[in-house]
């Protein structure tokens, strides 16, 4: 990452951490407590984004390489899922799984928007602006489903214990396990396609970056401490460069 982009990232990533904290604290000012919020995928994905953004900011400050692109892609996908599911499924009156939106006090309403809108947009922007390009693989889209499926198992087991499910599309009490299975297949395919979209955008940005370099952007300057090839070559007694071992020219007396 260039010095200029690193400075922008150092300002951008703490803003993500602050947005996550603001969203959780403001939401907790409503009827729900912090511990009551923890079982929700929304909170878990936001916490993951906040922790990862803080870690990435620390690495940028220490001038270390960016964290794992596969892990960053996973975190970005999960917070994207949070935003997409909320706006298209839970808060959409046309959705069969729409949840009636309560009259929230202003702090809680702001917290809700931080968690479902502001943080997802900031996380996607961070991934698009600062991550190295061309490192995501198609197979990652399948691997990234591990956490949502693990979350499903957690939510179903918890539902058996407390008779309460965090989301209507995995509510076994209302849908039955057959209905939950249908929802699971549908959402798993959608999440897989979102993962593929992330990989596709990564590759598209990589090609765009390569095309810009081909149009005349100068290549990065060599390191000042990089040894020159000629300087590193051994020289013989006559001052001429000596051939590498195994490739020495035969002497005149040995020919024939």
Which residues make up each language-model segment?
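N-terminal membrane topogenic signal
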Residues: 1-16
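Alpha-helical transmembrane segments of multi-pass membrane proteins
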Residues: 16-31
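Loop-to-helix transition at the N-terminal end of transmembrane alpha-helices
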Residues: 35-51, 70-74
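Membrane-interface loop-to-helix entry segments
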Residues: 42-45, 108-121, 181-185, 189
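Interfacial segments of alpha-helical transmembrane regions
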Residues: 63-80, 137-145
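Membrane-interface transmembrane-helix boundary segments in multi-pass integral membrane proteins
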Residues: 160-197, 251, 256
């Amino acid at each position: 990452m260039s010095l200029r982009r690193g400075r922008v990232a150092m300002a951008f990533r703490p803003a993500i951490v602050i947005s996550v904290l603001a969203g959780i604290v403001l939401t907790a000012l409503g009827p729900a407590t912090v511990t009551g919020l923890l079982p929700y995928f929304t909170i878990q994905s936001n916490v993951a984004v906040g922790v990862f953004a803080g870690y990435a900011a620390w690495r940028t400050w220490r001038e270390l390489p960016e964290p794992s692109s596969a892990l960053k892609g996973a975190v970005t996908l999960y917070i994207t899922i949070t935003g997409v599911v909320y706006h298209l499924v839970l808060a959409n009156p046309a959705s069969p799984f729409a949840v009636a939106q309560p009259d929230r006090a202003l702090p809680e309403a702001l917290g809700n928007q931080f968690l479902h809108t502001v943080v997802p947009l900031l996380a996607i922007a961070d991934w698009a602006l600062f991550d190295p390009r061309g490192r995501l693989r198609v197979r990652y889209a399948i691997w990234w489903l591990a956490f949502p499926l693990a979350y499903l198992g957690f939510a179903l087991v918890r539902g058996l214990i407390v008779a309460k499910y965090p989301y209507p599309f995995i509510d076994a009490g209302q849908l039955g396990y057959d209905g939950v299975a249908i929802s699971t297949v549908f959402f798993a395919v959608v999440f897989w396609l979102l993962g593929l979209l992330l990989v596709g955008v990564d590759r598209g940005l990589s090609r765009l970056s390569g095309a810009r370099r081909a149009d005349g952007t100068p290549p990065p300057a060599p390191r000042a401490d990089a040894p020159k090839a000629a300087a590193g070559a051994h020289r013989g007694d006559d001052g001429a460069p000596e051939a590498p071992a195994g490739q020495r020219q035969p002497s005149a007396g040995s020919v024939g």
